């Protein structure tokens, strides 16, 4: 796949998820999300079990700030030391922009969180859109992309990105299962995160492309 085709794919992916997010915003503003929210709550209640609750409590931790911040700090430090400085910058951009955008959107819409069954402590922040669904997925997908790229000669490398996509979908769903978000919160956040992921991929490709035209590229050197 040539560079132009890849870039077109990133733009197409970003636009697709931007449209989906816009639809969710429009449905929320129009008050048309109650049906899907109640259906998702009913589904989550129907499938709850002790094992499922333990599993999703673990999964949801991996998308929270208490986990992502120290992991990101360590990643940035290691990448910088190993001279993967472009990647270190993109880790910071990925999480920083997502966090700020999510907080601003939460404050703007000021949607209360679900009441009733909360299987983890209910966060004090507003509900729409979900921070776990908006911040973690783009970060994890970028990391998966780099791992698949750096270890392309390994047989398992082709499985990394599909496996991570399944994980981030479970991460997003965990918020509904645990009763701390409506599904409309989660879908909106997830669509925004995937849009941001494709924009990050596009930005990364552009940045690396410009560098290769200035200096002779050295494999695995930044």
Residues covered by each model-derived region:
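N-terminal transmembrane-helix/juxtamembrane module of multi-pass inner/ER membrane proteins
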Residues: 1-67, 107-109, 113-120
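Alpha-helical transmembrane segments of integral membrane proteins
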Residues: 10-14, 86-94, 156-163, 188
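Alpha-helical transmembrane spans of integral membrane proteins, capturing the lipid-embedded, hydrophobic core
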Residues: 18, 91, 95-99, 190, ...
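Aromatic-anchored segments of alpha-helical transmembrane domains
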Residues: 20-23, 96-101, 166-176
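Membrane-water interface at transmembrane helix exits
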Residues: 25, 41, 102-106, 110, ...
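Membrane-interface loops
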Residues: 34, 82-152
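Hydrophobic alpha-helical transmembrane segments
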Residues: 62-81, 137-143, 147
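Membrane-embedded catalytic cores of phosphoryl/pyrophosphoryl-handling enzymes
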Residues: 119-222
């Amino acid at each position: 796949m040539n560079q132009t085709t890849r870039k077109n794919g990133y733009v197409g992916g970003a636009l697709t998820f931007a449209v989906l997010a816009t639809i969710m915003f429009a449905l929320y503003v129009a008050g048309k999300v109650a049906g899907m929210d109640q259906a998702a709550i009913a589904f989550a209640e129907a499938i709850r079990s002790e094992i499922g609750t333990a599993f999703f409590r673990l999964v949801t931790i991996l998308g929270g700030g208490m986990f992502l911040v120290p992991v990101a700090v360590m990643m940035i430090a290691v990448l910088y030391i190993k001279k993967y400085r472009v990647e270190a910058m993109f880790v910071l951009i990925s999480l920083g922009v997502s966090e700020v955008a999510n907080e601003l959107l939460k404050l703007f819409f000021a949607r209360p969180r679900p009441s009733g069954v909360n299987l983890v402590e209910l966060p004090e922040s507003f509900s729409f859109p979900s921070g776990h669904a908006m911040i973690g997925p783009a970060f994890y997908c970028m990391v998966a992309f780099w791992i698949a790229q750096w270890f392309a000669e390994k047989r398992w490398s082709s499985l990394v990105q599909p496996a991570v996509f399944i994980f981030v979908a479970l991460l997003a769903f965990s918020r509904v299962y645990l009763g701390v978000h409506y599904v409309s919160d989660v879908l909106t956040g997830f669509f925004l995160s995937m849009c941001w992921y494709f924009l990050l991929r596009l930005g990364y490709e552009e940045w690396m492309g410009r560098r290769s035209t200035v200096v002779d590229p050295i494999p695995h050197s930044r």
